[in-house]
A protein has these predicted regions:
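N-terminal secretory signal peptides that target proteins for export/translocation
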Residues: 1-16
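Bacterial N-terminal signal peptides
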Residues: 14-33
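Beta-sheet-rich non-transmembrane sensory/scaffold domains
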Residues: 35-660
């Protein structure tokens, strides 16, 4: 058991206040390649500079070949350590070993349309993301504080039905975080991470037509913690569950493959030797570019499971690369961008690699790149078969809280997907378009339609007193940049139909700015909610329900003014605010509030911190429901104003009472 690594997320609880209110140290800046030119010249330059390469990456042919590869890496590492020791005159002092540090848009492409109504604010239509509330027939399914709940909503009802633990009956849930949940047909999947058992935990539950839940099975996957302050570890396309897990390897180990991802079905008395490797050598790919183990080594695994079978039969594909990573899923492919963890020398984070894993089971391909994306919203695989990525010169991925502390120059990488190969070639300098660098450190970005929007705000820290900041709007097809002034920081960017909305604080008040995305992008309107702050920071905390080409209603959790962003881990939102959008002009229609005085002790045993938040605006079949902790508050619109219709409590005690 990985007892040494239990405190990683737990330690953060005591350190969070200090970390997110401290002044962020300015990181060294590395210039990204940025050139502009006509497409003909760029294309010619790209072709002329390409080296001969295979179309896809090569997997190891045998276990022996893979082990020989690791032995070679280890030997090269030892020689490099000796060389540095002699050069520095400090022979015998070991080099820093980062490899064993286990501490822990609106889619432009025609995404597959989901016939079922979605209640999750996803990056791509048809690509669901692991969250805390989902819809199953006439029932809401909620994951909260280590338990699963169902609430009946059919025929106008709002009634708690069922509650079960989000883990097996014989599992000790201590030191385990149950973070994400997805629903496929009559299967509920819970994704968690266990420091006690050392890996990703996948729980399968049955849900029937009446909304009753029952436990089916649990599987453990050997991995490091997947947690990201912004990203989600799992996706669902149709019945296909896709989840990403990193595993940091020790290149000094005699056989690093002993640490490879493995799975076991949980039962009482389960032993470590029951783990069965799910990634054979013939499914481990590496690029032709040499890996520098001095900056860390990781196995990035994408596991795909067909939930239509009712079991946990999965295929896994893995790539070897640097440890820094960002995981992105488009309707067509899975992308993993890896960045070296190098903290010395003049070329920090200059070498990166992006891997493409098609969902049609074709072999992975790769491309050498520079810098690092901020998070999954830095990506767009567009319908013209290009990968568009915003990169910063000083970033290391979005694991844990890495996305909250990026810095450096900014560029837009736009490269044809056809340029990916076996990793021999790098993206051309013509593929990068230099962009203005905003002031500030908490960076937000989002692709909406044919535009990329970005800026900086307060994020997880204390609200900054910003009476004005820059919002940059980039046409990703031609690179034209518009610089807009907003009267607040940029803490959230969301699609508003074919336009956008930017949310941020001035230190005391919460601002909502609508952005018209046309030939000349512009700020169309601003609404100010005085004395408020965002109650949720994750993308799922927001939802916009259109009811016309240029109209609809949006919902966002709000809290008290001046609250630091990280407090959403501990505090429930005070209310969910609803605004009406009419041609990019906002009007408040009201809010649905929490009644915190009614809160009761839920006897929480597991996952007692809301890492993924606890409040959501829900628009379901013409109804509006605010999820505020254990409360579900339904509202109705009368004369353009929100009025509370009813509220229910779905806590464990309330479910018992409701069931009689």
């Amino acid at each position: 058991m990985n007892r040494d690594f239990r405190p990683v997320r737990i330690f953060v609880l005591s350190a969070t206040s200090f970390v997110f209110t401290a002044v962020v140290t300015l990181l060294a800046v590395i210039a990204l390649a940025a050139c502009a030119g006509n497409s003909t010249t760029a294309s010619a330059s790209r072709v002329a500079g390409k080296k001969p390469a295979n179309k896809n990456m090569r997997a190891f042919a045998t276990e022996d070949e893979m082990k020989a590869y690791f032995r070679k890496l280890a030997e090269e590492r030892r020689r490099e350590v000796e060389r540095r020791s002699v050069t520095a005159g400090i022979a015998g002092e070991p080099a820093q070993d980062l490899a064993v540090n286990k501490a822990e848009a609106q889619p432009t492409s025609p995404a597959a349309k989901d016939d079922k109504e979605s209640i999750t604010n996803t990056q791509h239509a048809g690509v669901d993301e692991g969250g805390i509330v989902k819809l199953h027939g006439d029932h809401l399914v909620v994951l909260r504080r280590g338990r699963l709940f169902t609430v009946a909503i059919g025929d106008g009802a709002l009634k708690p039905l069922s509650v079960v633990n989000a883990y097996g009956p014989e599992i000790d849930p201590r030191y385990t975080w149950y973070d994400e949940m997805l629903v496929s047909e009559d299967t509920v999947v819970v994704i968690g991470y266990s420091y006690e058992r050392g890996g990703t935990e996948v729980g399968l539950f049955n849900i029937d037509r009446s909304g009753n839940l029952s436990y089916r099975s649990t599987y453990h996957l050997r991995s490091n913690d997947y947690y990201s302050s912004r990203n989600y570890a799992s996706r669902l396309i149709g019945n296909k569950l896709i989840f990403y897990t990193p595993l940091y390897l020790n290149p000094y180990a005699a056989d690093p493959s002993l640490e490879f991802p493995a799975v076991r079905k949980w039962h009482k008395g389960a032993k470590p030797e029951e783990f069965q490797r799910i990634v054979s050598a013939t499914h481990v790919y590496r690029s032709e570019r040499a890996i520098n183990p001095d900056s860390g080594l990781a196995l990035h695994t994408v596991t795909t499971c067909d939930l239509a079978n009712g079991d946990f039969k999965c295929d896994a594909t893995a790539v070897l690369g640097p440890p820094g990573r960002v995981f992105y899923v488009s309707p067509e492919s899975v992308y993993v961008w890896t960045t070296e963890w190098s903290y010395y020398g003049p070329h920090r984070n200059e070498k990166s690699m992006v891997y493409r894993m098609p969902l049609d089971r074709d072999s992975p391909s790769a491309l050498g790149v520079s810098g690092s994306p901020v998070d999954q919203f830095s990506f767009l695989e567009s319908e013209d078969k290009h990968l568009n990525v915003l990169v910063r010169s000083n970033g290391s991925g979005d694991d844990m809280w890495s996305a909250e502390r990026t810095a450096g120059d900014v560029a837009l990488l736009r490269v044809p997907v056809s340029e990916f190969d076996d990793g021999t070639n790098d993206a051309s300098s013509w593929d990068y378009h230099g962009l203005p660098k905003p002031r500030g450190y908490t960076f937000q970005n989002r692709f909406v339609g044919e535009y990329l929007l970005y800026g900086t705000g307060s994020g997880w820290g204390a609200p900054e007193n910003k009476s004005e900041s820059n919002l940059f709007v980039v046409n990703w097809r031609d690179g034209e940049v518009s610089q807009l002034k907003v009267n607040h920081g940029v803490d959230r960017i969301e699609a508003l139909g074919s336009d956008a909305i930017v949310v941020g604080t001035d230190g005391s008040n919460l601002h909502f700015s609508s952005i018209r995305l046309a030939d000349e992008p512009a700020v169309a309107d601003e609404f100010v909610r005085k004395g408020a702050s965002q109650g949720e920071l994750r993308s799922h905390g927001f939802f916009y329900k259109p009811d016309g080409a240029n109209s609809g209603v949006l919902g966002l959790p709000i809290s008290v003014p001046g609250r630091s962003g990280y407090r959403h881990l501990f505090d429930e939102s005070a209310a969910i605010l609803f605004l009406r959008n009419d041609g990019l002009h906002f009007q408040e229609v009201g809010e649905l509030t929490a009644q915190s005085e009614r809160a009761v002790d839920d006897a929480c045993r597991a996952s007692c911190v809301d890492w993924y938040g606890n409040s959501r605006p829900l628009f379901i079949r013409g109804r509006i429901i605010a999820m505020l902790g254990y409360e579900l508050v339904e509202g109705t619109m009368k004369n353009g104003q929100m009025q509370e219709l009813r509220r229910v409590n779905y806590s464990p005690q309330a479910v018992k009472i409701a069931r009689g």
